[in-house]
Amino acid sequence: MASPKKKLQGLVAATITPMTEHGEINFSVIGQYVDYLVEVQGVKNIFVNGTTGEGLSLSISERCQVAEEWVTKGRNKLDQIVIHVGALSLKESQELAQHAAKIGADGIAVIAPFFLKPWNKDNLINFLKEVAAAAPALPFYYYHIPALTGVKIRAEELLDGIQDKIPTFQGLKFSDTDLLDFGQCVDQNHQRQFAFLFGVDEQLLSALVMGATGAVGSTYNYLGRKTNQMLEAFERKDFSSALNHQFCIQRFINFVVKLGFGVSQTKAIMTLVSGIPMGPPRLPLQKASREFTDNAKAKLKSLDVLSFTDLKDGNLEAC
């Protein structure tokens, strides 16, 4: 894995936690999963135990085991592995942060606690500071996802002077549609070498224009190659091509959102596209319906989003 001092950029797959039909973690497929991300999707950075990975539905012991398996299987294959260590309990977050450092992760990320919430910037920074201090050698990222946490403190406000309080702070996973807030984060901190990682896959091109340095998302598990094509087009200033790639990705996301799209459905799609069994989600989530899977499969076949990927009925080149 890369030096933790290397800036995190490009695509970062928010990894799924594979499970058996009985709801236990299926560690046996993680090595295959790593190879699939690198060799098929061209994605070499991962974000473990986040929303997509059902991190907050796992026990502390399970989260440690999952993190360790990804680090072990990703060694010399992945560039950077960031472990989400957020929890409702400060002590649990600190324990997870210490474990991430012990196993050789490249960074840690934390969401705001969302039951007994911090109601202002100072409260939130005090919490984040204590977690970061538990792993003082690791880069620290704030995971901003107000729609799920209910913590409405603007990221722009949080970033103001944050390195004075948290010296290891290196960036932000911004999972919100407020592009004004995101843009101000970039604009007011452009002299700092922060990683600005956008977390709304269907809006990534807009965020790139505003200065995003990378992206963390669930769709990069199975649409990583297509999204990388968009990044490459943007980099060479072929904005028309980049826009076409984004629109193509949006057509699929828009379709599945209308059907009902979340972690359960992400697992079903990843199983379908990769051939690696992701299993069901953990309760209270329910397994995606067969109707959803059939409809998603048909939509994937109708769009130019798949290259060198296998569906159940055989190899499917770009359709």
Swiss-Prot record:
Q: Where, subcellularly, is it found?
A: Cytoplasm
State any GO CC term.
cytoplasm
List ligand-binding residues for aceneuramate. T51, T52, S175, G199, D201, E202, S218
Question: Which domain of life does this protein belong to?
Answer: Eukaryota
Reactions catalysed, as given in the entry = aceneuramate = aldehydo-N-acetyl-D-mannosamine + pyruvate
Pfam families reported for this sequence: DHDPS (PF00701)
Q: Which GO terms describe its biological process?
A: carbohydrate metabolic process; N-acetylneuraminate catabolic process
Top enzyme class of this protein? lyase
Describe the pH dependence: Optimum pH is 7.6-8.0.
Question: Can you tell me which residues form the catalytic site?
Answer: Y143 (proton donor), K173 (schiff-base intermediate with substrate)
Major subcellular site: cytoplasm
Which key words are in the record?
A: Carbohydrate metabolism, Cytoplasm, Lyase, Schiff base
Name the Enzyme Commission number(s) assigned to this protein.
4.1.3.3
Pathway of this protein? Amino-sugar metabolism; N-acetylneuraminate degradation
Q: Which GO terms label this protein's molecular function in UniProt?
A: N-acetylneuraminate lyase activity
- Of which family is this protein a member? Belongs to the DapA family. NanA subfamily.
What does the record give as the function of this protein?
A: Catalyzes the cleavage of N-acetylneuraminic acid (sialic acid) to form pyruvate and N-acetylmannosamine via a Schiff base intermediate. It prevents sialic acids from being recycled and returning to the cell surface. Involved in the N-glycolylneuraminic acid (Neu5Gc) degradation pathway.
Quaternary arrangement and interactors, per the entry?
Answer: Homotetramer.
* Name used for this protein in its record: N-acetylneuraminate lyase
> What is the name of the gene encoding this protein?
NPL
